Amino acid sequence: MTPVLEAGVLPAMQELHVSNDILDNRVALEAAWERDGYWFFRGVLDTEAVERLRSKFLDEIAQLGVIAPGDPIARYSGKSLSEFPFRMEPLAARKIWKPFVAEPAIHRFFTRLLADEPFWIPTVEYRATPPAQDRSRPRFDYVHQDGFYNAGIPFLICWIPLAEIDADVGGLVLAEGLHKGPYLHDLSQPPLFPIPDGAVPANAWRRTTYRPGDVVIMHLNTPHTGVANYSDRFRLSMDIRVMATSGNTPIVGNITSITQREVAVQGEDGRSGTFTLDESTYSRGLDGGKVPLDEIPMRFHPGDEVILASREGRVTVLRPPH
């Protein structure tokens, strides 16, 4: 059975499983991960740290005039969104994720979860999503699997709500248990290779009402999407990727040279090297689409900040952080 995505209608779906009671049970955690493709934890992130992060979102969108200064609800003022930075580039430029993950309570939680020091991958999405202006479309934004676009980077996706997000506000929905099958993306539809409508069974979708302090941790192959905001306020969330430091982590750093055939990088942690590019490399542009091999030197330049994953000297993924 596949979902019929009617305009403006959020399909009925079950609640996410809550994993708080197995947080310190490694065997149970791994079993839930294998079964579901995610963990959902209620109220585990320090709410004061979350509030400090949220205040940076509120200050930014208040400066744009789309909410009233000091409005804790972030109610939309009605101002034109024609120049609104939907990818929140000002926040991305400030890298506000760094002080957040460095907060002692946040660091402790992820160290506890991973049983290792966290290695943060700076693929961060800052979401300050206004109420939908066009309500004639289905509410699912773009169903996708992160792993399709990031081969060779076995990260965990961390989705963090910064305010209460109910069904009207939208938020995250995910497809439970579909992380074990093949990629659902349509290889005949470059450059984004979208997942076809109806590829995810209706009974797989899960969501809940999210609150500050909650976090969803997803397998990189779990299909998921944002949901259009039908409330009167902005939807505030941040998602970021993490790995255990002892894992096969990518190089995060800057390009030192690049041609159509190879790229050299210098990593922030001291790792460096020259790696081969070929047709199988997923070189990702800012829009998420695959950059053709012959266009890579025109889209990436020495000095650019990148994330690079490799296998046996060959680049599997080359992408900007944001």
Region spans (language model):
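Double-stranded beta-helix
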Residues: I165-T225
